[in-house]
Structures are given as structure tokens and as C-alpha cells.
């Protein structure tokens, strides 16, 4: 199953990652406000999320001439938030895309990745994300998903939880 392959590769990638948790750096990042993803989605009427994505496992390379900041700037005035794919191996994303977009665009940003470690939550906050995506199928134990939701809330996020069936919905709500 592709999700299992992505998650396995993500764990290996994180083991080799240069990112090291630094509480002072995280607290400094938390002093700076980020645009509220929740407020952008809770407004009256239709809410639109633009996506910055270079590739996908199903479609391959989507945009060969890929400039994430320029794509994000094109969304300004047309969308309420931006989803930034940061998964490197299958989507050709990068955490740096998120950081650069945050520096150049004043919209709520969703870090869209396969979160398998709390470090990814901390890193997302440091890079300027407004929230993160948690996939119930990846964090498929009640205590793990609940723990990650609490960690995300602890850094100021209201995480977006993706579910695929009734069991996962119950898991997310418990």
C-alpha cells in the first residue's frame, strides 16, 4: 500500500534529517503570531485552500517549472489559506518551501506532510505554519493521535485531521 511505503520512507528520512529540536528556537517562533487557519476556515461562506504541490505518486511531476513562492503569491486574494506539501520523497516537497512562502505571503499555511514524529510539529511551527495535517491512518492508535493533537495545540495549532472511514472519525473524536 502506498501510504505504508510513504510512512516507512518518512521515518527513514527523519532519522537522517538535519533538524534538531531546540526549545529556545521553538519559543522564539511561538512569540511571532501566525495567521489563523481555523479562523480562515470558520468564516461564513465558502472557504478555499490553495495547494502548493510539485508532484504526487499518482500523477508524477505536476509542475516541472516549480516556484513555490510565486505559486503562493498567485493565490493571494483568491484563497483563504494555502496547503504546502513538504514531503520530499513522493511529492518532491521541502520544509524550505513552507518557510519561504511564510516569509512572502500573509495567509494561513497548512503544512501537508506525513507526520510521524512530534519533531515535525515543532519544525512546522518554527517554519511559519499556521497548522499541520494529521492523518488518522498514519497515527492509528488512540493515544498516538490524541498525543499529536495535544502537541499541536501546545504550539498554537488547531490541527486538521484527515480520516478515511468511520473508525478513523471515531479515533479522531475520542
Predicted features along the sequence, with ranges:
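Conserved N-terminal beta1-alpha1 strand-loop-helix module at the mouth
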Residues: 1-109, 116-118, 151, 156-174
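Short, charged, surface-exposed secondary-structure boundary motifs
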Residues: 119-120, 141-145
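Glycine-rich phosphate-binding active-site loops on the catalytic face of alpha/beta enzymes
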Residues: 126-143
Amino acid at each position: 500500500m502506498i501510504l505504508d511505503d510513504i510512512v516507512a520512507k518518512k521515518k527513514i528520512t527523519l532519522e537522517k534529517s538535519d533538524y534538531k529540536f531546540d526549545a529556545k528556537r521553538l519559543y522564539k517562533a511561538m512569540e511571532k503570531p501566525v495567521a489563523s487557519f481555523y479562523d480562515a476556515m470558520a468564516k461564513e461562506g465558502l472557504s478555499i485552500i490553495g495547494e502548493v504541490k510539485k508532484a504526487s505518486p499518482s500523477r508524477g511531476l505536476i509542475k516541472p517549472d516549480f516556484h513555490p513562492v510565486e505559486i503562493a503569491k498567485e493565490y493571494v486574494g483568491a484563497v483563504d489559506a494555502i496547503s504546502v506539501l513538504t514531503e520530499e520523497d513522493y511529492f518532491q516537497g521541502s520544509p524550505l518551501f513552507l518557510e519561504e512562502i511564510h516569509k512572502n505571503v500573509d495567509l494561513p499555511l497548512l503544512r501537508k506532510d506525513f507526520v510521524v514524529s512530534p519533531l515535525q510539529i515543532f519544525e512546522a511551527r518554527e517554519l511559519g505554519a499556521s497548522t499541520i495535517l494529521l492523518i488518522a491512518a498514519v497515527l492509528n492508535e488512540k493515544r498516538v493521535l490524541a498525543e499529536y493533537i495535544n502537541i499541536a495545540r501546545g504550539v498554537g495549532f488547531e490541527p486538521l485531521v484527515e480520516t478515511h472511514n468511520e473508525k478513523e472519525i471515531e479515533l479522531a473524536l475520542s
